[in-house]
Amino acid sequence: MTTKVAANSAAYEAIVRAGPRVKQLQQVHAHLIVTGYGRSRSLLTKLITLACSARAIAYTHLLFLSVPLPDDFLFNSVIKSTSKLRLPLHCVAYYRRMLSSNVSPSNYTFTSVIKSCADLSALRIGKGVHCHAVVSGFGLDTYVQAALVTFYSKCGDMEGARQVFDRMPEKSIVAWNSLVSGFEQNGLADEAIQVFYQMRESGFEPDSATFVSLLSACAQTGAVSLGSWVHQYIISEGLDLNVKLGTALINLYSRCGDVGKAREVFDKMKETNVAAWTAMISAYGTHGYGQQAVELFNKMEDDCGPIPNNVTFVAVLSACAHAGLVEEGRSVYKRMTKSYRLIPGVEHHVCMVDMLGRAGFLDEAYKFIHQLDATGKATAPALWTAMLGACKMHRNYDLGVEIAKRLIALEPDNPGHHVMLSNIYALSGKTDEVSHIRDGMMRNNLRKQVGYSVIEVENKTYMFSMGDESHQETGEIYRYLETLISRCKEIGYAPVSEEVMHQVEEEEKEFALRYHSEKLAVAFGLLKTVDVAITIVKNLRICEDCHSAFKYISIVSNRQITVRDKLRFHHFQNGSCSCLDYW
């Protein structure tokens, strides 16, 4: 008996020494078979765990099948390992085999399987696992519930995530973080911020994971005050400014209009990775500082920084497009394909078309798309949308109409394409065609996306939509805006009304333009603050008239006004914009 135990122990030590290396594990396995230990449950379990760690899935399954009656320990080993290694399909498959073998799962089983369902975004399967956990008596287990909050969040079911969270008898910091992250990642930034406040009221102290999600939520909404408080908290509490936190702070300051502060954070980071470099390059690009973006990209290459990836190249190409750096953009695109052997995706192609089109190289941009067409890559609507924007900018209306019609053929239910075609017709004076397009949109119930603008005043955020009258001080805001526009007209402002429906009188067009959401937001901001810069976040692109008006408003108010629209930043000061009207 002693000899058998010693042999078993020696075999176990041999497996441990082999580690997660497939060839050595296979040699040990062969030795076990020869020496009569090939069906030892404990030894096979260890072999299976290490084989799975080596991602040798086929070999793992072969070993698993050699066990005559797998028990709960063995099933949990493979389920936990496949879940941890992000092999969700295999994890779910072993869970199903476990059930068919009449082996009872544990809380660890459910936690791992639910995580895999989250990785797959498999809402229906995950709900089934949730029901099974409840029936099995693990519905209120702390680990299972925390995994369920993450699962429902990743599947976009925040109502389900909130219900699970609210039923938790004991809420952990992990569960709170999952809920904050879930709301933020599903675009519900305000809800994420509210959950953070509830977390603090419940006596939980935030950690780095909390702040990464919270900073992203602040960046979405433009809540710079809360974001700055987080930064100060990190400093005062002596928290480590790790890569994730540093990158989140760069994104916060960038998206809230302070690219200088973003660079300060970047320069103070002890450790950086490709995500941090890309975030800083993107910050320069969206603010119109294309040359700085290219210089930082060159520094990344020359100073032995991290190897740029596809996202990095999107950031630098976009920066070149916004700043009119055509030669630099061509060079970057060439280096991407030749030096780094990266395959450009739709985003890179869109940047190239946008860059060439904005700069007036319409023929080259059009040729670029047709070269992609020959390889079957020109069906992406975003390519033609970028080309259409260039046609509108350079008043090539005939080509614009052709492209707009092509877009409508690709996506007939996208109201944005119909609106762009209508605008092209309006600019070219074809009022009958404008009416035809608008009537067609009405018949097909195609509605233009509602625009809104957000402004933060005294640590509170306020949202405005076009013609908004929901604010308590609507009357005062509208009167102040009237005065503001009148003062702007005295120094040369003239409303740009070409794109407003041509069936109405000029006075009505001006009225329609006057109450755009960003104008209401800037009027409110100027009313409620003194001698401070105004920052507005808009969900759509700023229109040509508002862009013109804001240059004049910056003069009459003697304020700096920053607008973050769908694509970039505009910094208005003393009658000019940082984009140099190149947008």
UniProtKB/Swiss-Prot annotation:
Give positions of region: Type DYW motif. Answer: 490-583
Q: Which residue intervals correspond to the PPR repeats? A: 71-105, 106-140, 141-171, 172-206, 207-241, 242-276, 277-303, 309-339, 345-379
Where are the stretches annotated Type E motif? 383-458
Q: Which domain of life is it from?
A: Eukaryota
Pfam families (alphabetical): DYW_deaminase, E_motif, PPR, PPR_2
Keywords from UniProt, A to Z, are: Repeat
Query: Where is the region Type E(+) motif?
Result: 459-489
Q: Per the UniProt entry, what are the Gene Ontology biological process annotations, in alphabetical order?
A: RNA modification
Q: What's a single GO MF annotation on this record?
A: RNA binding
Q: State the family it belongs to.
A: Belongs to the PPR family. PCMP-H subfamily.
Q: What is this protein called?
A: Pentatricopeptide repeat-containing protein At2g33760
Q: Which organism is it from?
A: Arabidopsis thaliana
